[in-house]
Amino acid sequence: MRTYQPKPADVQRVWHVIDATDVVLGRLATQAATLLRGKHKPYFAPHIDTGDFVVVINAGKVALSGNKREQAQYHRHSGFPGGLRSTSYGELLDTRPQIIVEKAIKGMLPKNKLGRAQGTKLKVYAGPTHPHQAQQPTPFEIIQVAQ
C-alpha cells in the first residue's frame, strides 16, 4: 500500500479563535504554531501547507512568566547607522501587544517560503473583538497547569 500524499486541493481549512487572557505566551505560541502548520491533522505533510487559520484575541491580556515584562527586549533597526531601537516587553504590551504575540508565534514556524505562507493565516487582535465572525471560527481552549 502506498503512502498517502496530500494535495493542496485536498486540504480542509478551519478557522480557530484563541482567547489569550491569562495564558502564558510560550504555551499560546506553541499551540497556535501547531494549528498553523497543520500538525494536528492526520494527513500532515511537512512540505505542504495543511494548516488552519488562527485568530488570537485579547493579546493585551497575555501572561509573561518570570521577569520578561521588564527584562525582555524587542529590537528593531531602521537600517541607518545607529538606528537600533529597543523596547521592553512591558512597554510594548501596553501599547501594541499584538506584536509580541505575532513574533512569538511566527518564531515557531519554519524559516522558509512555506513558513511565511503559514504565517499569513495568523490574525492577532489586542481586544476581544475581531472581524472574522463570518468564517464561524471554533473556540480553541488552551489547557494549562495552574500558574
From Swiss-Prot:
PROSITE patterns (alphabetical): RIBOSOMAL_L13
One GO location term (cellular component): cytosolic large ribosomal subunit
InterPro entries in UniProt: Ribosomal_uL13, Ribosomal_uL13_bac-type, Ribosomal_uL13_CS, Ribosomal_uL13_sf
Keyword field: Ribonucleoprotein, Ribosomal protein
GO terms for MF: mRNA binding; structural constituent of ribosome
Nucleotidyltransferase keyword on record: no
Alphabetized Pfam families for the sequence: Ribosomal_L13
Complex and partners: Part of the 50S ribosomal subunit.
Function: This protein is one of the early assembly proteins of the 50S ribosomal subunit, although it is not seen to bind rRNA by itself. It is important during the early stages of 50S assembly.
Family of the protein in this entry: Belongs to the universal ribosomal protein uL13 family.
Protein name: Large ribosomal subunit protein uL13
The gene coding this protein: rplM
